């Protein structure tokens, strides 16, 4: 499984509730066309804890999406870049509300695990 962490800030004057609504619609559309396995809700950073040690990045908002494999990840990227579907229009509306966006992907490993 591949995971994608999106970290970002909302531009000044943008409405969090509108972003959440668009994000939920975006996920519904991506699930309907099998472009993601699952995704978590949008969230806010909890930086006033010793567990948050990242001083290099200041983003305050996050989301996490999960993809079956590299093929699904790449297909989702191509789908969004095509800008031809309702979900891609929603993605563009969301992206225009963001600033300081950074995306990080990683893949699960099965080292030391029996996969039979």
What are these regions (language model features)?
Residues 104-115:
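Long, low-complexity, Ser/Thr/Gly/Pro-rich intrinsically disordered segments that act as flexible linkers
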Residues 24-38, 52-60, 64-105:
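An amphipathic, aromatic/His-enriched active-site/gating alpha helix that lines ligand/cofactor pockets
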Residues 44-52:
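Carbohydrate-binding/catalytic loop surfaces
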């Amino acid at each position: 499984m591949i995971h994608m962490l999106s970290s970002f800030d909302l531009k000044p004057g943008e409405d969090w509730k509108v972003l959440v609504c668009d994000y939920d619609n975006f996920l519904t559309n991506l699930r309907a066309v099998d472009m993601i396995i699952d995704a978590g809700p949008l969230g806010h950073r909890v930086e006033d804890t010793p567990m948050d040690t990242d001083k290099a990045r200041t983003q305050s908002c996050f989301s996490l999406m999960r993809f079956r494999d590299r093929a699904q990840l790449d297909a989702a990227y191509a789908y969004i870049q095509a800008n031809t579907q309702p979900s891609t229009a929603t993605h563009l509306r969301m992206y225009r509300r963001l600033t300081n966006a950074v995306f990080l992907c990683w893949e699960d490993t099965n080292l030391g695990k029996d996969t039979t």
